[in-house]
């Protein structure tokens, strides 16, 4: 993800060092036990929603933001925010937020996401369209699974949906 984020940053004229730091640390809390993730969030007054308690894998982003600051000394608010929103997204994300969200989805080791080759191409031409296509695929994937979808992801899709294009898989 780090190198993909750096490549996207260069393509869009963004600070590639910031992007690479965020890409490197975006999953820094992923392997923590669920209770530790919850504890990190609660100690730092970060809301843990019912959906996050039901799907604790989502919590690594919020906990990762805290860990990046406390354990790795990251102070840049844009880097910390990009780590925080890289799983659910949020409406009207800034450039770094979108770069990390997208890099996490298109990184070279990912191979099972639907429409990945097309989405990888879009990533280097239009961040907003790429967000729309990733969120569309993500919500369709999650709708076929047991469990609830984070409302923030739904709101994020509603924000980016107008940027999406009519793709063959949407029919």
Residues covered by each model-derived region:
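Divalent metal-dependent catalytic cores for phosphoryl transfer on phosphate-bearing substrates
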Residues: 6, 11-133
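Charged phosphate-binding loop/patch that engages nucleotide di/tri-phosphates or the phosphate backbone
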Residues: 140-171
